[in-house]
Amino acid sequence: MTRKESPVSRTPKSARAVAVNSPLGRTVRLELPAHSAGERPHGLPLPSVVVLGRSNVGKSSLLNAVLATKVARVSQTPGRTQALHWYRVDDAFHVIDCPGYGYAKTARESRDRFAGQIEELLTGERGPDLALLLVDGRLGPQDSDRSMALFLRTAGIPTVVAATKWDAVKSSQRVRQLRALAAEFEDPERPLLPVSSETGENLPTLGRLLKDRLIGRPRMGAAPAAPQGPRKKES
């Protein structure tokens, strides 16, 4: 007989706050690995930023770098993040790491489940206050990233875009690549920042930008359902 999971999960006993020295804060802990968008950390809701991106965009590496601790599991195999991971920073806000989207080798059932989790999280009554959309700086704009950016805009979620793996972009190509990304994603309400988990380029700036936009921002209410999004209908 399997134990029925509570829709509101408590912090695991093994999840202890880790002292860090990062642009986002001084302590961080994994508060909840959730397998459905309905699972939330126990207690009063805190402001939250959701981290989104294609599989293998470097989400886990970036989270570890910007939080200055190895809290997220890093794998060379795309699609290893298979739950919503809630990280509590300074007891002030949550960072939510989502499964990556767009990895063709992931089983369709899993892709649909991940897409459903993300859509429910973004459009639910207690949606995130901010989104960090990661795009691969080496590849330029991808259709799946365009779709997610549109989904976030339609849902009314303020967004910061970070171009990852910037250290792997040749110096001679950086200006052209950044212009292409900016033309697609950047506007006065949606800043774009090239970053590198390897060299630390622009990570302090990214951390301060996210924190400034989270702290003091009023909690969002229900986000309107988006007409289109990352979820695919099951056959």
Predicted features and spans:
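Amphipathic alpha-helical transducer elements in NTP-driven molecular machines
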Residues: 81, 111-115, 142, 200-203
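Glycine-rich, phosphate-binding/catalytic loops in enzymes
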Residues: 68-69, 80, 111-114, 148-152, ...
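Residue-level signal for inorganic ion chemistry
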Residues: 87, 164, 206
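Flexible beta-alpha connector loops of hexameric P-loop NTPases
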Residues: 101-111, 138, 167-170
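Canonical P-loop GTPase G-domain recognition
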Residues: 25-38, 168-223
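Active-site glycine-centered loops adjacent to acidic/histidine catalytic or metal-binding residues
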Residues: 97, 164, 196
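Conserved G1/Walker A P-loop phosphate-binding module
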Residues: 2-105, 215, 220-234
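Conserved C-terminal guanine-recognition region of P-loop GTPase G domains, centered on the G4
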Residues: 116-190
